[in-house]
């Protein structure tokens, strides 16, 4: 994957001047200062005020560029100008939040699986393992949001009476569409839901039944299943994309910039003087070839702050949903998600949000968001850092996921006034502006999508 998931530690915003740098690194969460640097790169850029262009997205007509649909399942595009936090938010949402249809194979408290009910299984695979394999079968439903689980039933019964091994595949599953109370269910061609591979023309392999021996009962498998709606955040079976849902920094093809990076690499890592290297063409060619294999990726487009602003996206669908739809749906979901928090500065808080004084030596407040993770935390932190720190509306912003097994995210906001309404206003403003940004992106995507 091209981007590293956000850290679990609270990540503070950059200081506004070198004079504000702390004398020593904090040893604990409580000792975090109001404006600590996040990296050495930010230390160097700390005294440079963020340009206005970084504070709001560019016009919607220029966000998505070079959209190329290489196949029915593969899409490439460039997202610019924006920041890495927003690009990563889009990537993570496509992976975890876009809905698809699958068989749930979770083990319930009674020991059974939720959507897959195995009644006969004489294979070496345990029921749990077999249900897991069944749950990973891609089910082709083009409009998952309109899916009604009660309309279709899936079942399979295979017995191997022969002496040869028998493959049991998804194509063996029988699909029935339920009709009226007095009507017989309609048999539906299973190829509608389980597409064969275009090369082998086979469907997904579930298990293998060994050949029958004279002294033994034949191996068999029998189950029924219900297909339901879910997301990749719940289980990887519902992920609409492959591992090729990623982005990289757009390469800077400026020859002078590339030469500068090459010279720095020679001096720092190879201990070679670039001028002296001109006298040895063979050695120069070797080093240039080595540079082009990996180090050239450090030559990417940067803004005035030295941060990447252009991102090359690749989105590959597992074959059920089109990549164009996946991007559009992710933007729609992001807009709806942040809008839930756009009014926390007025009236009662949503049931999923709690506010308490910050557990630190600073004036501020901790916002605990239920059922949120790094995606929302990094999004809000990025916008507030870019837009509210310099204007002194807040003094600090950072987030963390307190525990990987608890479905919650903590966002810490520092305010000089010490008033919770000021902190709530900052978070609400971030939510509203992010919602507007993703609305603009949706409009831009609709105008260029292929």
Question: Where are these predicted regions, by residue range?
Answer:
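Protein-protein interaction/assembly regions in multi-subunit complexes
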Residues: 2-22, 29, 33-450
């Amino acid at each position: 994957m091209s981007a590293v998931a956000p850290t679990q530690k609270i990540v503070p915003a950059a200081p506004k001047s070198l004079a504000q740098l702390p004398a020593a690194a904090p040893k604990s969460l409580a000792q975090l200062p109001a404006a600590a640097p996040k990296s050495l790169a930010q230390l160097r850029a700390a005294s440079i005020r963020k340009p206005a262009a970084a504070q709001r997205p560019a016009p919607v007509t220029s966000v998505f560029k070079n959209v190329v649909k290489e196949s029915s399942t593969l899409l490439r595009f460039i997202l610019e100008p924006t920041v890495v936090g927003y690009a990563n938010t889009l990537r993570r949402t496509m992976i975890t939040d876009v809905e698809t249809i699958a068989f749930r194979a979770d083990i319930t408290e009674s020991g059974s699986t939720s959507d897959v009910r195995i009644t006969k299984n004489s294979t070496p695979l345990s029921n749990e393992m077999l249900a897991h394999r069944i749950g990973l079968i891609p089910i082709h439903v083009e409009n998952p949001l309109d899916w009604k689980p009660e309309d279709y039933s899936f079942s399979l019964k295979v017995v191997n009476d022969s002496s040869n091994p028998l493959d049991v595949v998804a194509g063996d599953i029988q699909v029935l569409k339920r009709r009226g109370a007095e009507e017989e269910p309609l048999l539906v061609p299973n190829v509608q839901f389980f597409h064969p591979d275009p090369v082998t023309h086979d469907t997904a392999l579930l298990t293998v039944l060994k050949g029958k021996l004279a002294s033994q009962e034949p191996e068999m498998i029998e189950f029924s299943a219900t297909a339901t709606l879910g997301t990749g955040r719940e289980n990887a079976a519902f992920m609409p994309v492959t591992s090729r849902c990623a982005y990289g920094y757009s390469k800077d093809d400026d020859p002078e910039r590339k030469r500068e990076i090459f010279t720095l690499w020679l001096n720092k890592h190879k201990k070679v003087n670039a001028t002296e290297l001109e006298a040895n063409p063979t050695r120069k060619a070797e080093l240039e070839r080595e540079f082009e294999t990996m180090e050239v990726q450090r030559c990417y487009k940067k803004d005035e702050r030295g941060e990447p602003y252009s991102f090359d996206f690749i989105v590959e669908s597992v074959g059920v949903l089109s990549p164009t739809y996946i991007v559009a749906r992710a933007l729609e979901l992001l807009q709806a998600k942040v809008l839930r928090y756009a009014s926390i500065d007025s009236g009662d808080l949503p049931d999923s949000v709690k506010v308490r004084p910050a557990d630190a030596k600073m004036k501020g407040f901790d916002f605990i968001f239920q059922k949120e993770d790094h995606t929302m935390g990094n999004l809000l932190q990025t916008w507030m850092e870019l837009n509210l720190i310099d204007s002194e509306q807040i003094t600090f912003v950072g987030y963390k996921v307190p525990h990987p097994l608890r479905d919650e995210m903590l966002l810490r906001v520092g305010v000089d006034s010490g008033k919770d309404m000021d902190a709530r206003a900052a978070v609400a403003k971030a939510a509203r502006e992010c919602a507007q940004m993703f609305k603009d992106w949706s409009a831009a995507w609709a105008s260029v999508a292929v």
